[in-house]
Amino acid sequence: MRILAADDQPLVLTAIMQSLKDTDFELHFAKDGKEAMEKFEELHPDLVIVDLNMPGKSGFDVLSHIKNSNEGKTHVMVMSGEDDEAIKVKAFNAGADEYIQKPVGLNELRIRTQKILKQPINVLSSGDSESKKDSQVIQKNIVGVVIPCYNEETRLKAETFKKFVNANLGYHLCFVNDGSTDNTLQVLEELAEGREDYISVYNCPQNGGKAEAVRQGILHMIKDPQLNYIGYLDADLSTNFQDFDDLVQTISNSEFQIVGGSRIARMGADITKAGSRAIISKTINLMIRNILGMSFQDTQCGAKVMTREVAQKMFIEKFKTSWLFDVEIFLRMKNYYGAGKVQKLICERPLKRWVHEDGSKLSMKDSIKIIWQLLQITFSKK
């Protein structure tokens, strides 16, 4: 039996292929609505799996085309991140037989596909070598994450990164090697090998500092049109992926343009800082609040996610400072959107966990440099 899957995000099509490749279905793919209509006429598939939000011809256009072409001979399954009931009703009225809301597990997608085509249900048992698919999820959004790396050869938690991209089919991790003098580049290339759809390596031959590494990574990732959001995360995973995913959920369900983690110590949270580091952080934060004119609790947490608009407009020019580029991002947003509007576009989300990892590159000496860089930012405003 033939299945045609249509989605403008290649990572979603790859996930569908992973879900169904161990079945007897003949799989075909289309990258947009126009191609889906053309392949539908060519292939006459038994099932079409279609996304609603595609450029040009939308999923609704595809539904209408199928409905008017073959009098219900082809089953149609909508797979979308849209959770509005009115959208779902509209899809069913347009001819959809099934509506799957993302995020959705690969095993659930496989079972629903087999059921709609009246095929034997093939559920992978816990003893199956491929049972790992049970925990793999097609995410609602496609998110690119820039991870700057400098001399991380011995610290990089490769297995943690592997497990994350295996379970979360909607993330692409871009590791930026910032001119490392050890074997970091080799470690990163080995990590990406065989996982090119989900992990890439961007190599900067010379060390330019964290700010420039993140900027180069963002500019590289923005070229990928499938990404709904782009963010960055420290390589030591002081902020873990669970908290980062919370940032993504926040921005995707709001009008915020950028959401950052906030290391606020509170009941129920595991926020661990060295005593001296905590004191300096508070001092720096007071200075930042005065510079920005905004009541931030924590601008310097290395976990943030943003819209494509912010990624495209706020990373064009190099940053003046190495450690305080987060502050410069907010200043650029303030200048671009205006002081009155910008505070409605920025969100701080408290983290559940943040741990100062051994071997962190930020030292007491660096903290003094940060204060000096704050003064540079202050003078550059005048």
Kindly label every feature range from the protein language model.
Residues N177-Q186, L237:
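A conserved acidic beta->alpha catalytic loop
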Residues M54:
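Receiver (REC) domain active-site loop signature in two-component systems and cognate sites
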Residues P10-H28:
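Two-component/phosphorelay signaling modules centered on CheY-like receiver
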Residues Y202-H220, Y229, F241-W323, E357-K365:
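Acceptor/aglycone-binding surface of glycosyltransferases and processive sugar-polymer synthases
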